[in-house]
Swiss-Prot record:
<dbReference type="Pfam" id="PF02875">
    <property type="entry name" value="Mur_ligase_C"/>
</dbReference>
<dbReference type="InterPro" id="IPR013221">
    <property type="entry name" value="Mur_ligase_cen"/>
</dbReference>
<dbReference type="InterPro" id="IPR000713">
    <property type="entry name" value="Mur_ligase_N"/>
</dbReference>
<comment type="similarity">
    <text>Belongs to the MurCDEF family.</text>
</comment>
<dbReference type="InterPro" id="IPR036615">
    <property type="entry name" value="Mur_ligase_C_dom_sf"/>
</dbReference>
<keyword id="KW-0961">Cell wall biogenesis/degradation</keyword>
<keyword id="KW-0132">Cell division</keyword>
<dbReference type="InterPro" id="IPR050061">
    <property type="entry name" value="MurCDEF_pg_biosynth"/>
</dbReference>
<keyword id="KW-0067">ATP-binding</keyword>
<dbReference type="GO" id="GO:0071555">
    <property type="term" value="P:cell wall organization"/>
</dbReference>
<dbReference type="InterPro" id="IPR036565">
    <property type="entry name" value="Mur-like_cat_sf"/>
</dbReference>
<keyword id="KW-0573">Peptidoglycan synthesis</keyword>
<keyword id="KW-0436">Ligase</keyword>
<keyword id="KW-0133">Cell shape</keyword>
<dbReference type="GO" id="GO:0005524">
    <property type="term" value="F:ATP binding"/>
</dbReference>
<dbReference type="InterPro" id="IPR004101">
    <property type="entry name" value="Mur_ligase_C"/>
</dbReference>
<keyword id="KW-0547">Nucleotide-binding</keyword>
């Protein structure tokens, strides 16, 4: 890739990964972000020049300008590049260009679990094939990075459906974890439009194999809608109707055990990640690796080393009011994700009381899923509900934190982190486990605890 490329919004996890990948593929790379952070420091350590002011950037020196969704079309550097006729590419559009440097690409998409599933597959392939690479939307714990370029053979990518940018991509293999109602403004609040976009994605000429979870209603709807016979379509899940069925799921000493029926073989696996949903995610990766020709024994040995992605069921031990308490930090922010996480906590800690500290994320999500929240938020033994993290949205009347728990009783409303800690100090002991959850800044609460 012999190009000079400027990355705008390079302090974000997605664009920073592309900048590193481009550099390792031979491009001359520079980046801009108005705020320096740990990611920009990492880029500078790799020899990438970082600008924090538009004034020092000579846009005319670059062949391509790549920008994140956080960069407005009126941004001076983007406006200048367009006026000079320089090729300007949104993040996913550049990822599509980058993919052409690789022989084989596997895209993971879906409303929930795509980052975790991408991390599982990335961890497997990096052990099974030293020339495999990945670019995903979270920090893969196995590699302590969201990006690794080990060659130009196989590439694992996370394909984002939230803004329909996955339609720019042309992978050879697609894994769909599920299809659910989220980011519906992208699809004009139409489930059929959402399904049509997924259908368009898997119908691309480049796609040869499709794996989807038949336990999910959205995936079943896609199967009913999709009728092309020129691709290898494999369903997986706990359902007896799955092409690859999962069974014998159980937990022993906090390790997840399960089996799959693959073709005529019954194969057993162990996984450090908790919950039925992670078994589904892992199964998609297992069968993709089996179909690539990797040996069962090698996959099994690699799977037990999978530790997932940062902020997905991260485990800590904290001292709270003199008690040693297990604390879990999790990114889940949709009713389905909340329910799955609480179920996973129950499976792993069946004899402990679950205290759920939840920070809702976006008023629009509260509003759009208002009927689904009460059931999900009733599943823990005690709910502590924080104010909604706005993500720069304006407050929507009837969509604040207290509105998503209408009809529930026994929950505690906290007005901030200090208030939540006050409740935890009263409630927590050795017989409790605390799940701290949300996509906003609630992860900071984990660090504050027991300081």
């Amino acid at each position: 890739m012999n190009k000079k490329i400027l990355f705008l919004g390079v302090g974000g996890i997605g664009v920073s990964a592309l900048a590193i990948a481009a550099k390792r593929l031979g491009a001359h790379v520079a980046g801009y972000d108005s705020v320096a952070n740990k990611l920009t420091a990492k880029l500078e350590a790799l020899g990438i020049v970082i600008f924090t002011s538009p004034n020092g950037v000579d846009v005319a020196n670059f062949d391509i300008v790549v920008y994140s969704s956080a960069i407005l079309s009126s941004h001076p550097l983007l406006s200048q590049a367009r006026s000079l006729g320089i090729q300007c590419l949104q993040r996913a559009m550049f990822l599509a260009v980058l993919m052409k440097d690789f022989s084989y690409s596997i895209a993971i998409t879906g409303t929930h679990g795509k980052t975790t599933t991408s991390s599982v597959l990335a961890t497997l392939l990096c052990q099974l094939d030293k020339y495999s690479s990945f670019i995903v939307g979270g920090v893969v714990k196995y590699a302590d990075s969201n990006i690794q370029v080990n060659g130009t053979d196989k590439l694992v990518i996370e394909a984002d459906e939230s803004d329909a940018s996955f339609l720019f991509l042309s992978p050879q293999v697609v894994i769909i974890t599920n299809i659910d109602l989220d980011h519906m403004a992208t699809y004009n609040n139409s489930y059929q439009t959402l399904l049509e976009n997924f259908t368009d994605f898997v119908s691309k000429e480049s796609v040869k194999s499709i794996y989807l979870c038949v336990d999910d209603q959205g995936c079943r709807d896609l199967l009913a809608k999709y009728n092309q016979s020129d691709k290898n379509v494999t369903s997986y899940g706990f359902s007896i109707n799955a092409d690859v069925q999962i069974y014998d799921y159980h937990i022993i000493d906090e390790i997840t055990h399960f089996k799959i029926r693959y073709k005529d073989d019954d194969l057993s696996f162990k996984l450090q990640l908790p919950g039925r949903y992670n078994v589904q995610n892992a199964t998609a990766c297992i069968i993709a690796c089996l179909d690539l020709g990797f040996k069962y024994e090698d996959i099994r040995n690699a799977l037990i080393k999978v530790t997932g992605v940062a902020r997905r069921f991260d485990l800590y031990t904290k001292v709270i009011s003199g008690h040693q308490v297990t604390v879990i930090d999790d990114y889940g922010h949709h009713p389905v994700e909340v329910a799955n996480s609480i179920s996973a906590v129950r499976d792993r800690y069946p004899n402990k009381k679950i205290i759920h500290v939840f920070q809702p994320h976006r008023y629009t999500r509260n509003r759009d899923l208002i009927k689904d929240w009460p059931k999900a938020l009733s599943l823990a033994d005690q709910l502590i509900l924080l104010p909604t993290y706005s993500a720069d949205e304006q407050i929507i009347k009837g969509a604040e934190s207290q509105d998503i728990v209408k009809g529930l009783s026994g929950y505690l409303l906290a007005d901030g982190f200090d208030h939540a800690i006050y409740f935890l100090e009263k409630l927590a002991n050795e017989n409790t486990v605390i799940l701290i959850q949300g996509a906003g800044d609630v992860t900071n609460l984990v660090e504050i605890l027991s300081e």
